[in-house]
């Protein structure tokens, strides 16, 4: 953010809508377009033809981002300046208070074979009932001397783990190998101050495997994103906005909460999200709507399911446009190509629509089409100031 941006902030009776399709980006291969390019998206195509398009680099060229830094960039926070671990995000999403000295981690319920190798990093995406039972077993079976261990279920395979005790540091490497066919990693201390925490995590791993030994799928925990309590400057302070978030998954609700958004809901699905946003439209001037479906399908390697998830978002766009936002941006936080079944470094398509945005030659919303758009190829963190300008919220700079 430019150092003098705050001096340019200009009050305006305008509203901004940021729609994030998680994992939207992909790429074409073997005579087939990306998932977005193969989707039937008449509403998004009309918006693209009437607005401006481009490609966003979530963190930097060639860098594969996690969801946390990718979203921070979209909110106008430099991901290299504001570094958040997944544990802190999950804790904020579940409204679990982290005290000074606590260490939080995001954990996946996962499946190990008889040789101790990971066969499924997400334990087959268990139902909430199945995952809740696994968390109950963990609470009953894990007891570490001098350490208070908290387990909280987030959604499906996602679990929050919080460690509280003397001498703990979050400066640890992950135990999640981010791959199958290999054993979980051993948490290593990045600094001498984290030696005690590494010992605690090793004991946590041992006891959690024992507690889950009889579970057919969710029989271990993979931990990543160790972090402690975090505070970020609010969007109200940085950008003069009164922002709100409509998200289903706790982690994204937590990230929104950390940057000072009013977190609405909960809402169970996309339809409920749109209704909730509509009902609160006059209460805020910036809305973040998060749609998880494309990312989940991409991570499962399911091209068709990702297409369906994109088309579901397209179908609700008329309801959102009926609210008459002054600026709408539709984009993704990162790419999750189904060919890779994982996050990737690819740039993410973005479209901006509104009366002050202007029109470029792009007529369809897709990766290759967006290459020729007026927004160009730029860091995702640039997006916030462009939205502020397009909504009449920045005064002229200089004489």
Language-model segments: which ranges?
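Feature captures the catalytic ectodomains and active-site-proximal regions of enzymes
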Residues: 1-399
């Amino acid at each position: 953010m430019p150092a003098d941006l705050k001096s340019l902030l200009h009050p305006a009776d305008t509203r901004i809508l940021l729609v994030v399709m998680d994992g939207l980006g992909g790429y074409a291969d073997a005579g087939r377009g990306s998932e977005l390019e193969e989707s039937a998206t008449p509403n998004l195509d009309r918006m693209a033809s009437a607005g401006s398009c481009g490609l966003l680099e979530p963190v930097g060229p060639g860098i594969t981002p996690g969801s946390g830094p990718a979203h921070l960039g979209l909110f106008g926070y430099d991901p290299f300046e504001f570094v958040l671990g997944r544990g802190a995000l999950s804790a904020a999403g579940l409204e679990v208070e982290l005290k000074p000295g606590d260490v939080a981690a995001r954990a996946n319920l996962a499946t190990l074979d008889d040789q101790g190798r990971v066969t499924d990093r997400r334990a087959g995406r268990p139902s909430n009932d199945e995952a809740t039972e696994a968390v109950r077993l963990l609470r009953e079976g894990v007891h570490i001397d001098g350490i208070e261990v908290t387990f909280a279920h987030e959604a499906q395979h996602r679990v929050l783990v919080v460690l509280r005790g003397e001498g703990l540091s979050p400066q640890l490497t992950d135990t999640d190998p981010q791959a199958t066919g290999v054993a979980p990693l051993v948490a290593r201390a990045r600094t001498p101050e984290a030696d005690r925490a590494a010992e605690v995590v090793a004991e946590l791993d041992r006891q959690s495997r024992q507690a889950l030994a009889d579970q057919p799928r969710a029989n271990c925990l993979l931990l990543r994103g160790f972090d402690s309590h975090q505070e970020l400057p609010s969007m109200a302070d940085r950008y003069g906005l009164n922002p709100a978030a409509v998200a289903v998954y706790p982690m994204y609700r937590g990230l929104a909460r950390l940057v000072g958004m009013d977190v609405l809901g909960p809402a169970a699905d996309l339809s409920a999200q749109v209704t909730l946003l509509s009902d609160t439209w006059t209460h805020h001037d910036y809305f973040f709507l998060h749609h998880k479906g494309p990312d989940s399908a991409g991570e499962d390697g399911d091209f068709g399911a990702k297409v369906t998830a994109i088309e579901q978002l397209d179908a609700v766009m008329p309801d959102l446009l009926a609210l008459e936002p002054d600026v709408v941006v539709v984009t993704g936080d990162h790419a999750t190509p189904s060919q890779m079944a994982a996050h990737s470094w690819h740039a993410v398509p973005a479209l901006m629509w509104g009366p002050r945005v202007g029109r470029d030659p792009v007529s369809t919303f897709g990766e290759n089409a967006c290459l020729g758009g007026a927004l160009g190829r730029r860091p995702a963190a640039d997006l916030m100031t462009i939205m502020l300008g397009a909504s009449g919220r920045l005064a002229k700079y200089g004489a």
